[in-house]
């Protein structure tokens, strides 16, 4: 989607957009829920040392193993679910057209929410729904829905709407595992649901603002 000279700018802007939103969240919470005098916190830090090659290798292996396990569990499961919903209708009959499938019906219900952002196609909204399981599954879902023909992405996005899509994907709820962690740390389902709602609302508002500015600039 993006010209070669702009790809680095796109990636860096996404990186800083995430940082900026994190800072804004912190400032808002500091002025509202956590306002008051800060509690003194003292912690003795150990001496810093250059890590050994063994410890670095072990850390890399653990991170790689975690990703592989996720790829062969959550992402694989999401792909299977998408394939099933894509090929059957409400009566569990095999469909000849994806537009008649359960997946199309589910995506079509949600699609109007994303139309103001520039990507109201049901396939895009479906990919974002599966992203709740793992953000990586957004890509695999689009691949399945497009039959592996990534050239068809040009029919769903322009370079600008693709950027808006990346903004939304960056900012909305990370994954089921993150939600479960929030639920465990916060202690209630209500608190976790509230955080998910705030994250999704933030993603929509920021993406809508970016899209609006782009439209005014003729992008």
Question: What residues fall within each predicted segment?
Answer:
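Flexible glycine/proline-rich, aromatic-decorated loop/lid segments
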Residues: 1-3, 29-42
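Alpha-helical transmembrane segments
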Residues: 7-25
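Juxtamembrane inter-helical linkers in multi-pass membrane proteins
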Residues: 35-59
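Core transmembrane alpha-helical segments of multi-pass membrane transporters/permeases
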Residues: 40, 56-87, 124
């Amino acid at each position: 989607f993006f010209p070669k000279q702009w790809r680095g700018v796109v990636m860096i802007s996404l990186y800083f957009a995430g940082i900026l939103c994190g800072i804004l969240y912190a400032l808002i919470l500091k002025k509202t829920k956590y306002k008051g005098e800060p509690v003194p916190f003292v912690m003795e830090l150990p001496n810093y040392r250059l890590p050994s090659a063994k410890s670095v290798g072990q850390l890399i292996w653990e991170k790689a193993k975690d990703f592989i396990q996720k790829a062969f569990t959550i992402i694989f499961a999401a792909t299977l679910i998408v394939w099933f919903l894509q090929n059957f209708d409400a009566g569990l009959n095999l469909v000849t057209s994806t537009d008649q499938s359960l997946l199309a019906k589910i995506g079509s219900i949600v699609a109007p929410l994303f139309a103001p952002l520039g990507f109201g196609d049901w396939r895009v909204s479906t990919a974002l729904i599966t992203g709740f399981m793992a953000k990586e599954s957004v890509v695999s879902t689009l691949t399945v829905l497009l039959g592996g023909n990534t050239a068809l992405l040009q029919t769903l996005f322009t370079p600008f709407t693709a950027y808006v899509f990346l903004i939304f994907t960056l900012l909305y709820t990370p994954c089921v595992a993150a939600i479960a962690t929030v639920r465990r740390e916060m202690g209630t389902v209500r608190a976790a649901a509230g955080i998910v709602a705030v994250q999704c609302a933030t993603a929509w508002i920021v993406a809508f603002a970016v899209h609006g500015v782009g439209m005014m600039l003729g992008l």
